[in-house]
Curated annotation (Swiss-Prot):
Protein name per its UniProtKB record: Multidrug resistance protein MdtC
Induction, as annotated: The mdtABC operon is transcriptionally activated by BaeR.
Native organism: Escherichia coli O17:K52:H18 (strain UMN026 / ExPEC)
Pfam families from the UniProt entry: ACR_tran (PF00873)
Domain of life according to the entry: Bacteria
CC terms in the record's Gene Ontology section: plasma membrane
Gene3D superfamilies the record matches: Multidrug efflux transporter AcrB pore domain, Multidrug efflux transporter AcrB pore domain like, Multidrug efflux transporter AcrB TolC docking domain, DN and DC subdomains, Multidrug efflux transporter AcrB transmembrane domain
UniProtKB keywords: Cell inner membrane, Cell membrane, Membrane, Transmembrane, Transmembrane helix, Transport
Gene: mdtC
Assembly information from the UniProt record: Part of a tripartite efflux system composed of MdtA, MdtB and MdtC. MdtC forms a heteromultimer with MdtB.
Transmembrane segments: 3-23, 333-353, 360-380, 387-407, 431-451, 463-483, 528-548, 853-873, 875-895, 897-917, 953-973, 984-1004
Length: 1025
């Protein structure tokens, strides 16, 4: 009593307290960062190593395995995968959430150092690492194009000047440059000319290496001067290399230009990048795991004018893709939804109270509660994101509930003739415990979420804390500011209402009278009502089991990623043509705004595309509908497949794949894995629940297998090293010398001129100089035949692995796909030596599925404990919780009606309903208990009177919550995929709950009262609490 009086009789202090809360919230709002979702990125580090010319199997055994053994001993590694291809290995380390990325990086460097002695000596550089997830979509893609500069020169500008500067920007984790390679002097040898001159490829390599040497020469001094010695020991351009003497034949000089074509070119000619049909260099920028995407993008944009000044004017630097516009648009949509929710909630209050003066009170309480929450969000290190803003949108209906309960009860006393200040004090005292019970039990719902681990726990924590803080501030405001305003603003008389609102008042009275009559019938047919309640419980179980489920709603971020997978024996030239064909198909689609792509590198049969769609208001289709339309056109391209997927704000795991979800096969028997993977993949491709099924196992690449006749080699004076060196010199794009420039280092690359390697007969033109100086053709001591060989070798942990990727067809859920895969694996009878498990997002979905029911039960148990403590009763909390089954049925039926799968967002809605719908029961039970204690009424009379007396606030609070969530259902535009499931769940649950709990709660109350009396030692005592 004294607590409430302190604020009611000190209006200035109460107002200033509210102003202080609001000002703190405004300051917090201005400092909050912006993000699409809460920070849920796993710490990921990528380790890269190269050994030019080494086969995938050699890279896996000699490079990947030693590194994996060393890296696998690092604490906190939750997953380690590797992929080895021609000349390169990449190892992805995913760490636990609580592992600091910088500390993990230090451990990774130490592990690399420890494994260094076990790695091949021919590696051109030590393994390196990057603190970025290569499977994440770039947050920004920059392109460089020019009509005057070559691709190699553009790549040089990008890698030498732009990439290092961008990498230093806060939040940037990795800048990957693609589309070409660094400039180089390429030496294309003519094997027939070499044979005629009696010059071996090793002779050429040695001559070039010896002619381009950068060594210190020292200095000369006399008594007064000092001269530094400088020589012309370096060759820098193709023109300088052409006259180089590499051999003398019969006294005549053999120059490099006589036996080779020397050009200024690039290190690796098997790279290509394009943007909108124009050759381009791509800078793909990825953020650090803990970085804020909006802040990072803004920092990059601010740096672009300075970057443009560092490159020639003839080079066009453009932003080809930017993830931030759709994120900003999505947040703007949520903010608009929040404003609409506040307006609708206040409208509901006005319609029920029919007084502008009374409506002002909750109209003030709601903004104070919501704005004050921003201060707590800032102190907790949260961001303004879709989930936290949705929490505030839903909180609109919650925070007004407390004010409504207090206001309505005070207004009831005023209408009875009580003085305003006395009515404020008496009314607040009567419902103070009720409001406290409602708020604490609602916050209790989120305690299990706060204790939940893993990615779902991280994802939902900001939502739960934000909503809990808003409810806490609302509780404070409703017990301080609201009664004070009622006491000083409302009059001790029945408020005058406008004529146009009298009809609503009469309708509400008629509705209340009708409810009273139907409630009497329900209380006289308790068994029938009880059967209905039991039926809703059974229906809940059936609906939850049968409803399609997924991890997170599929988002339309306006960005697509595409992975090209061509025939494993395809040449680079043909692959570049496939890239151009696919890009043209994509570019011609009316919903596409920009297309960039690249191919080449160690995997010549693959490529990547990044597609920016037009804004939502300029297209009528969703991203998935566009993918479905393009899939039909892309299927007509022979010899290659382009797999498209919509970029999501949440992607788990470090695997780069061509689809959204992964299923990984593991085995310690590589032969068994290679035998069963094609069978499993073909089976999964036939399932209607899956689309775009593909695999990263590529073991059918074309190979030319050379078999040495060692006896003949010994007789001819040739060793294996010389033969292998010949092949590497001829076909390996061997880097044989380094050109040092002020800004970078460039290579001299030697190979047989591609004009002479168009078919297998090129091997017949190769020869080796034996120990007697004679030229011995390769065909004399070697035979060759075509064979198949892997293009890549993949590991997970230290086991051989193959990952099958898949997308979901329209109308199918992740639970459908998971069940179908499990059935297929059982039908195939896969041996125990091959183990299958879901990976990435699909793995997290499986884990979340297993914990959802436990989480809901934990929330109900927590609410029961809190209510039991508040009511000092084991029974009354059960009465209050009996409202939940009807809400669950309504939520699940609504999801089915809108064809929306049960996702993590829908789970949030269920958790919220646990907190919302019990408010009705709390108001009924509180007043019934009070009537029994002080009114000497029977339980049936007490609960009947409580239901009628609290009918108006029950309708007000329910409609306020419903209208607060309704804009989420009706919202469109960016980010609506996240908002709609939450709104659908809450609105459906509230409608069904309101229809049933007004009858089931009184019946359950009477049932437990009779049960209590039956087992009570004092059966004549009406109330035992």
């Amino acid at each position: 009593m004294k607590f409430f009086a302190l604020f009611i009789y000190r209006p200035v202090a109460t107002i200033l307290l509210s102003v202080a809360i609001t000002l703190c919230g405004i300051l917090g709002f201005r400092m909050l960062p912006v993000a699409p979702l809460p920070q849920v990125d796993f710490p990921v580090i990528m380790v890269s190593a190269s050994l030019p010319g080494a086969s995938p199997e050699t890279m896996a055994s000699s490079v990947a395995t030693p590194l994996e053994r060393s890296l696998g001993r690092i604490a906190g590694v939750s997953e380690m995968t590797s992929s080895s291809s021609l000349g390169s290995t990449r190892i992805i380390l995913q760490f636990d959430f609580d592992r600091d990325i910088n500390g993990a990086a230090r451990d990774v460097q130490a592990a690399i150092n420890a494994a260094q002695s076990l790695l091949p000596s021919g590696m051109p550089s030590r393994p390196t690492y990057r603190k970025a997830n290569p499977s994440d979509a770039p947050i920004m893609i920059l392109t460089l194009t020019s009509d005057t500069y070559s691709q190699g020169e553009l790549y040089d500008f990008a890698s030498t000047q732009l990439a290092p500067t961008i990498s230093q920007i806060d939040g940037v984790g990795d800048v990957d440059v693609g589309g070409s390679s660094l400039p180089a002097v390429r030496v294309g040898l003519n094997p027939q000319a070499l044979f005629n001159q009696g010059v071996s490829l090793d002779d050429v390599r040695t001559a070039i290496s010896n002619a381009n040497v950068r060594k210190p020469q020292g200095a000369l001094e006399d008594g007064t001067h000092r001269w530094q010695i400088q020589t012309n020991d370096e060759l820098k351009t193709a023109a300088e290399y052409q006259p180089l003497i590499i051999h003398y034949n019969n006294g005549g000089a053999v120059r490099l230009g006589d036996v080779a074509t020397v050009t200024d070119s690039v290190q690796d000619v098997r790279n290509a990048g394009m943007t909108n049909a124009k050759p381009a260099i791509l800078l793909m920028i990825r953020k650090l795991p803990e970085a804020n995407i909006i802040q990072t993008v803004d920092s990059i944009r601010a740096k672009l004018p300075e970057l443009q000044e560092t490159i020639p004017a003839a080079i066009d630097l453009q932003i080809a893709q930017d993830r931030s516009p759709t994120i900003r648009a999505s947040l703007e949509e949520v903010e608009q939804t929040l404003i609409i929710s506040v307006a609708l909630v206040i409208l509901v209050v006005f319609l029920f109270l029919r007084s502008g003066r009374a409506t002002i009170i909750p109209a003030v309480a709601v903004p104070v509660s919501l704005i004050g929450t921003f201060a707590a969000m800032y102190l907790c290190g949260f961001s303004l994101n879709n989930l936290s803003l949705m929490a505030l949108t839903i909180a609109t209906g919650f925070v007004v509930d407390d004010a409504i309960v207090v206001l309505e009860n005070i207004a009831r006393h005023l209408e009875a003739g009580m003085k305003p200040l006395q009515a404020a004090l008496q009314g607040t005292r009567e419902v103070g415990f009720t409001v406290l019970s409602m708020s604490l039990s609602l916050v209790a719902v989120f305690l299990p979420l706060l204790l939940m681990g893993g990615l779902p726990g991280r994802l939902l924590r900001e939502f739960a804390v934000t909503l809990s803080v808003a409810i806490g501030i609302s509780l404070l405001v409703s017990l301080t500011l609201t009664p004070m305003m009622c006491g000083w603003m409302l009059k001790a008389s029945k408020p005058r209402e406008q004529k146009r609102l009298r009809g609503f008042g009469r309708m509400l009275v008629a509705l209340q009278q009708g409810y009273g009559k139907s409630l009497k019938w329900g209380l006289n047919h308790t068994r029938l009502v009880g059967v209905v309640l039991l039926g809703t419980i059974a229906l809940n179980i059936w609906l939850y089991i049968s409803i399609p489920k997924t991890f997170f709603p599929e988002q339309d971020t306006g960005v697509l990623m595409g992975g090209i997978q061509a025939d494993q024996s395809i040449s680079f030239q043909a692959m570049r043509g496939k890239l151009q064909d696919f890009m043209k198909i994509i570019r011609d689609d009316p919903a596409v705004d920009n297309v960039t792509g690249f191919t080449g590198g160690s995997r010549v049969n693959s490529g990547m595309m990044f597609i920016t769609l037009k804004p939502h208001d300029e297209r009528s289709e969703t991203a998935q509908q566009i993918i479905d339309r393009l899939r039909v056109k892309l299927a007509k391209e022979p010899g290659a497949n382009l797999f498209l997927m919509a970029v999501q704000d949440i992607r788990v795991g470090g695997r780069q794949s061509n689809a959204s979800y992964q299923y990984t096969l593991l085995s310690d028997d590589l032969a068994a894995l290679r035998e069963w993977e094609p069978k499993i993949r073909k089976k999964l491709a036939t399932l209607p629940e899956l689309a775009d099924v593909n695999s990263d196992q590529q073991d059918n690449g074309a190979e030319m297998n050379l078999v040495y006749d060692r006896d003949t080699m010994a007789r001819l004076g040739i060793d294996v090293q010389a033969a292998n060196s010949l092949l590497n010199n001829a076909f390996g794009q061997r880097q044989i010398s380094t050109i040092y420039q002020p800004m970078n280092q460039y290579k001299v690359v030697m190979e047989v001129d591609p004009r002479y390697t168009q078919d297998i007969s090129a091997l017949e033109k190769m020869f080796v100089i034996n120990n007697e100086g004679k030229a011995i053709p390769l065909s004399y001591f070697a035979k060759w035949q075509p064979a198949n060989a892997p293009l890549s070798v993949n590991h997970q942990g230290l086991s051989a692995a193959s990952t099958i990727s898949f997308n979901l067809p329209t109308g199918k859920s992740l639970s459908d796909a998971s069940a179908a895969i499990d059935r297929a694996m059982t039908q195939l009878g896969v041996p125990s030596t091959v183990r299958g498990s879901f990976a990435g997002t699909a793995q997290v979905f499986q884990e979340t599925m297993n914990s959802q029911v436990i989480l809901i039960i934990a929330a109900i148990a927590t609410v029961y404990i809190v209510l039991g403590i508040l009511y000092e009763s084991y029974v009354h909390p059960l009465t209050i919780l009996s409202t939940l089954p009807s809400a669950g049925v309504g939520a699940l039926l609504a999801l089915e009606l809108f064809n929306a799968p049960f996702s993590l967002i829908a789970l949030i809605g269920i958790m919220l309903l646990i907190g919302i719908v019990k408010k009705n029961a709390i108001m009924m039970v509180d007043f019934a208990l009070e009537a029994q204690r002080h009114g000497n009424l029977t339980p049936q009379e007490a609960i009947f009177q409580a239901c009628l007396l609290r009918f108006r606030p029950i309708m007000m609070t329910t409609l306020a919550a419903l209208f607060g969530a309704l804009p989420l259902v009706l919202s469109g535009g960016d980010g609506s995929e996240l908002r709609q499931p939450l709104g659908i769940t809450i609105v459906g649950g509230l409608v069904m709950s309101q229809l049933l709990t007004l009858y089931t709660t009184p019946v359950v109350y009477l049932f437990f009262d009779r049960l209590r009396l039956r087992f009570s030692r004092k059966p004549k005592q009406t109330v035992t609490e």
